UniProtKB/Swiss-Prot annotation:
Keywords: Chloroplast, Plastid, Ribonucleoprotein, Ribosomal protein, RNA-binding, rRNA-binding. Coiled coil: none annotated. It is found in: Plastid, Chloroplast. It comes from Sorghum bicolor (Sorghum). Its main location: plastid. GO terms for cellular component: chloroplast; ribonucleoprotein complex; ribosome. This is Small ribosomal subunit protein uS11c. PANTHER family: 40S RIBOSOMAL PROTEIN S14/30S RIBOSOMAL PROTEIN S11.
Length: 143
């Protein structure tokens, strides 16, 4: 039986430097659109804002984590506000519809930030999924 010949200089060593800031360096500059749809997803742990064009193609997205917040600070109203401002500034919207999903603490703060940013809102919809007596909810937390 012959031994496998070890490879000299694997590709993993080359990619180590590239992976460190891959998220920030590979992000494309967002297209600038005048009319679009702003989707606000406010969970209890994070706030995610996605800006799409009227056809539904994603133009830009931002979350509290990408804005620099970590752990429990991602769930704060201030994080939701900063996330909304970041998404709108980058895209440069003038007219938009807003779709809000979830019941997190960043929900109202994100809506306030969108309204103050100067974007003309045509409608605000609550698209939070509500069960019609579907699955059994998880048991209550005991601390």
């Amino acid at each position: 039986m012959t031994k496998a010949i070890p490879k000299i200089g694997s590709r993993k060593k080359v990619r180590i430097g590239l992976r460190r800031n891959a998220r920030f360096s590979l992000r494309k500059s967002a297209r600038r659109i005048t009319k679009g749809v702003i989707h606000v997803q406010a969970s209890f742990n994070n706030t995610i804002i996605t800006v799409t064009d009227p056809q539904g193609r994603v133009v830009f997205w931002s979350s509290a984590g990408t804005c620099g917040f970590k752990s429990s600070r991602k769930a704060s109203p201030y994080a939701g506000q900063r996330t909304a401002v970041d998404a709108i500034r980058t895209v440069g919207l003038q007219r938009a519809e807003v779709m809000v999903k979830g019941a997190g603490s960043g929900r109202d703060a994100a809506l306030r930030a969108i309204a103050k940013s100067g974007v003309r809102l045509s409608c605000i919809r609550d698209v939070t999924p509500m069960p019609h007596n579907g699955c059994r909810p998880p048991k209550k937390r005991r601390l």
